[in-house]
Amino acid sequence: MAFCGTRTAARLSHSTRALHNTHRNFASQRTLNEVVIASAARTPIGSFQGTLSSLPATKLGSIAIKAAVERAGIPADEVKEVYMGNVLQAGQGQAPSRQATLGAGLAISTPTTTINKVCASGMKSVMLAAQSLMCGHQQVMVAGGMESMSNVPYCMSRGATPYGGVKLEDLIVKDGLTDVYNKIHMGNCAENTAKKFSISREEQDSFAIHSYTRSKAAWDSGLIANEIAPVTIAQKGKPDIIVQEDEEYKRVDFSKFPKLKTVFQKDNGTVTAANSSTLNDGAAALLLMTTEAANRLNVTPLARIVAFADAAVDPIDFPIAPAYAVPKLLSEAGLKKEDIAMWEINEAFSVVVLANIKMLGIDPARVNMNGGAVSLGHPIGMSGARIVGHMAHALKKGQFGIAGICNGGGGASAVLIEKL
């Protein structure tokens, strides 16, 4: 027994030394890599059943990925992994991100992952890619999001056909726009937020009008054009159609705003089709790399990723979740809200942005300065990547920008970048 005890003690001593050495070796490793945005590209955003409706999300994703790689000016085989957000995946076939990646001409050996965090999917893809690059798992990655809401199918339950027939369900509503906990539409959650923060319909309509006018001004000034990867649509027996401008922001009649009926709450409702985002098609992609890779490849980055964070609240309060993610960013970066030159808060509904402005106490003039999803459109898997990419283009050198987006289920994601 004494011999056995001595042997056990020796083993414990050896294990303790090994653990100590492991900790010491780990602690001596280099710090996290800095991650930069080398390029950002997106397709135009198409209206529901509009100009891009003939193309699946995966094709739109391919166009955005290819443009991001080309604009970074690097060989396609330098991209070692791809993350793409996509929410409404039914009927697209296996592994949508893989389809988009190979369709963009990237190497067959490129691993891919499809991310679904509802409306935050595109942004979460950027965050996950940044983590992988920071940790040194990869040196060059593409991240973004894609959605073709025009091509989302209907479904019916499997099983014996019941008496009276079967019920078809719209998967846009079922998988994209319904709070599964409270069994209500996202718009009802928006109405709850409007009531909680005393935000009137008039305020929401006014915000929506500003969104449209800002989007038009940004397009008219040429500010958005450099983000766009044109989409070519082949026509049988006719010239190809080349789509190179957002479709939604031009489809508006301001005189109808005050006359529209509320959609989700009949009595004392505030949310209408005019002050909400629309159903849309589009894709966005960012090429991310470490600064070491940027130096090796002679790439001049657009911006660097400073910090990112998620937050979660009660599912019905999902519209205000970004206000809980943003303080985490500022704390991590050692910045104050006054240091932020540009805010992009996704306009799922006008009330989302108005409520977050109130909660964060930020200057409305710095929020969605060039329009947002109410006017440009909201392809739900794309939008999070779009607003990060837009900031990377629109900020001026040395400025900081924060992009935040809410997602169904009570979540939000946010990213802080600095223009280089």
From Swiss-Prot:
Question: What reaction does this catalyse?
Answer: 2 acetyl-CoA = acetoacetyl-CoA + CoA; propanoyl-CoA + acetyl-CoA = 2-methyl-3-oxobutanoyl-CoA + CoA
Does Mitochondrion show up as a keyword for this record? Answer: yes
Q: Which cysteines are joined by disulfide bonds?
A: none
Active site per the UniProt annotation: C119, C406
Top-rank EC class of the record's enzyme? transferase
GO CC annotation terms, alphabetical: mitochondrion
User: Which residues participate in CoA binding?
Assistant: Y212, R251, V252, D253, K256, S277
**Gene Ontology MF terms in the entry:** acetyl-CoA C-acetyltransferase activity; metal ion binding
**Entry annotated with the keyword Cell membrane:** no
| Interval spanned by the transit peptide | 1-33
Q: Which Pfam families match?
A: Thiolase_C, Thiolase_N
Q: Where along the sequence does the record put site: Increases nucleophilicity of active site Cys?
A: H378
For this protein, what is the EC number? 2.3.1.9
Q: Where does K(+) bind?
A: Y212, A273, A274, V374
Q: In which pathway does it act?
A: Lipid metabolism; fatty acid beta-oxidation
Keywords in alphabetical order, please: Acyltransferase, Fatty acid metabolism, Lipid metabolism, Metal-binding, Mitochondrion, Potassium, Transferase, Transit peptide
Compartments (UniProt record): Mitochondrion
What Gene Ontology biological process does one annotation of this record name? Answer: fatty acid beta-oxidation
Q: What does this protein do?
A: This is one of the enzymes that catalyzes the last step of the mitochondrial beta-oxidation pathway, an aerobic process breaking down fatty acids into acetyl-CoA. Using free coenzyme A/CoA, catalyzes the thiolytic cleavage of medium- to long-chain 3-oxoacyl-CoAs into acetyl-CoA and a fatty acyl-CoA shortened by two carbon atoms. The activity of the enzyme is reversible and it can also catalyze the condensation of two acetyl-CoA molecules into acetoacetyl-CoA. Thereby, it plays a major role in ketone body metabolism.
The annotated subunit structure for this chain is:
Homotetramer.
Protein family membership: Belongs to the thiolase-like superfamily. Thiolase family.
- What name does UniProt use for this protein? Acetyl-CoA acetyltransferase A, mitochondrial
- Tell me what organism the protein belongs to: Xenopus laevis (African clawed frog)
